[in-house]
Amino acid sequence: VPKTNEIRPLGKDDDRSGFSCGQPDLDRFFLHYAGQNQFKLHLAVTYVAVIEARIVGFATVAGSSIERARVPSARLRKRLPAYPLPALRVARLGVDTRVQGLGIGKALLRHVLALAVEQRDRIGCVGVVTDAKPEALSFYQGLGFVPVEGVREGLLHGEPFPMFLAIDTIASALEA
């Protein structure tokens, strides 16, 4: 089983041309927009998993927020103020088809969760949000993400599924 040599921010000179996760929209984003969003527009940062100098996966993160009413836990909702709450968004996540199923996506997400704890400690963060594609739903659920409040019913087939993982859950898991 290959282990990632490192997970690090995307570099301006990284070769992304040989990467394919099997999802044309994710491949197109990684090849054409990840660098622009990071280096020119400053919208997001993409982290790459590297094995033997080859990029085998990526996760793009951005600052985000979640409305209190959408936080899935009623207990947590009661403790939070009524304004938009700071969160970290997993905007994109892809693993090269040649190494899928070997834990690289989980390693990338674990890196993102550690970033969320860092964000909590530096500027505030109540959790991680993502819009999971239907085919990625079980991946995120297996890592503890739950649907945000108000989207359990009526999602059209194929629409992304908004999910949330609370910072306390993240911190406990990372300390374990």
What are these language model-derived features?
Residues 1-40:
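Short amphipathic alpha-helix that is part of the acyltransferase structural core
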Residues 42-63:
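Conserved beta-hairpin
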Residues 46-51, 90, 127-132:
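Extended hydrophobic secondary-structure segments that form protein cores and membrane-embedded regions
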Residues 58-92, 155-158:
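Conserved acyl-donor/pantetheine-binding loop and adjacent beta-alpha core of acyl/acetyltransferases
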Residues 91-101:
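A short, internal acetyl-CoA/4′-phosphopantetheine-binding micro-motif in the GNAT/acyltransferase core
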Residues 101-115:
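Conserved acetyl-CoA-binding loop-helix of GNAT-fold acetyltransferases
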Residues 124-135, 149-176:
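C-terminal "cap" of GNAT-fold acetyltransferases
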Residues 130, 140, 145:
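Conserved active-site tyrosine of GNAT-family acetyltransferases
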